[in-house]
Amino acid sequence: MQSYHTVIGIFALGNSVLNLTVRDDDIGWTVDAIKRNMALKTEETFCEQIISGTDGKRVKTKISRAIETEAEHFTRATEYANKMYPLLLKNIEEAISEIYLKDLGYHRNTKYPKQEKINELIAMAEEYAEKSINNKNNEKAPNWEEEAQSNLFKRKRAAELAKLLETKCIFNEIKGSTNLERLNQLLATETGRKAIHTALIANRKRKIGSNMMDIIVCGSIPPYNELLGGKLISILSCSPTVISDYTHRYENQVSEIASRMKGQRVIRDSKLVYLGTTSLYAVGSSQYNRIKVPLSENSNLEFRKIGITEGFGTVFFSKETTSLFSKLLELQDGGKKINHVFGEGT
């Protein structure tokens, strides 16, 4: 930075929240999003109607009407299913390929996994969950294969593989002759919807830690706040320079958890493709609202509100109370289960 260089405002890129329903729904990473894309498109309007026998009392009524023909709906849904169904299958196979399997007794190319094997993996995960105490990180020069075989990651690998194989079995049982029929069959049952959810999450896990970030803007410093400096900082956070710097900063970054799950070094794709943000208040954001920058004849860079998040309250415990809870859990579990080790929290 230059000496006496003007500082208009401060911003940073932070890790995206893992579970954010309104964002995932907007991207298409939820079962509800798939159901909407498969459904007939409708338009809802509201009007007031007089209720008979009430001396002119009016009630607000919702009217729904189709905005596409049955033929248009069939064509659109078919195209969507032909794209989505193979993608769901691909997500499952790619997730399985990222798990170290040598000590799990599973062959990677098994097309039709058996329920007996899934039950074995579930039992293995439960067994190693009991052994996952006093975990330690080898942060200096980790041997990824040895790390994968640790009690903590053997438990994680067995549990993840069991879930993925169970999902694969559900997809194998679908008998439809077209992708449209197969996807509709999955959406029709709770088991099928659960399988879709697992396949979507498998994709989200790979994207959320590397291709997506949250914008954190602290606002502008006087006198630039009077010149809407905060909005300028928000716009510049999406600039080619920021995206390029992010890509180069993380292009050789080793994914700690993914490497331990696979038993070898994993470097995720670092191309930044999604920037989002959340706000403390739901009423609006003076920092981001009304931002719109023309890019070309048919496109704009603009802030788009996609929904309202749901949050939970927080509680505060004193250091003394926290220490006593920690000692109590150690006595109960026979050791420390939370040791600030990669993988314990996810």
What are these regions (language model features)?
Residues M1-T346:
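Extended, composition-driven regions rather than compact fold-specific motifs
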